[in-house]
């Protein structure tokens, strides 16, 4: 998630996410240069990673196929923005995990920017659930939802 300079929150479905460092803990996310979320993160220097469960597949797909410049994704999906402990970017109450990050480096590559965010706080829900992933055609994943050429799934049991 991110927040724009006027305080409007936004969500994005990110397929390019990885742990980039152990100590200090850093995540890297790759976001298209044309993305509103990328603009927000570049301007604000922070973001939050929200890990949804499989029950949120349709909401995640909506966030990945609509622009935050045109719609309020929280209002349209019915998801709940909650304040984090450190960053202004909102957490998502319904998600299994939320991680607050401060940008420590940005790297432009091709049509994407990679933001490296140091973890400054994290939250794990007490609810049990299977995390939702953006998947391709690889073996080992259970397809949960597919739309507009995008596939969401989870690791097979």
What kind of region is each of these model predictions?
Residues 1-157:
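Basic, polyanion-binding surface patches
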């Amino acid at each position: 998630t991110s927040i724009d300079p006027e305080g409007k929150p936004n969500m994005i479905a990110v397929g390019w996410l990885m742990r980039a460092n152990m100590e200090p803990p850093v995540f890297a996310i790759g976001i298209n240069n044309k993305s509103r979320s990328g603009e927000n993160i570049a301007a604000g220097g922070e973001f939050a990673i929200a890990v949804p469960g499989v029950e949120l597949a349709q909401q995640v797909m909506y966030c990945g196929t609509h622009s935050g410049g045109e719609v309020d994704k929280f209002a349209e999906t019915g998801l709940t923005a909650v304040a984090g402990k450190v960053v202004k970017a909102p957490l998502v109450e319904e998600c299994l995990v939320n991680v607050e990050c401060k940008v420590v480096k940005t790297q432009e590559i091709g049509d994407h920017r990679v933001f490296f965010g140091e973890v400054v706080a994290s939250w794990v829900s007490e609810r049990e659930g299977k995390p939702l992933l953006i998947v391709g055609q690889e073996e080992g994943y259970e397809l949960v939802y597919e739309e507009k050429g995008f596939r969401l799934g989870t690791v097979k049991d």
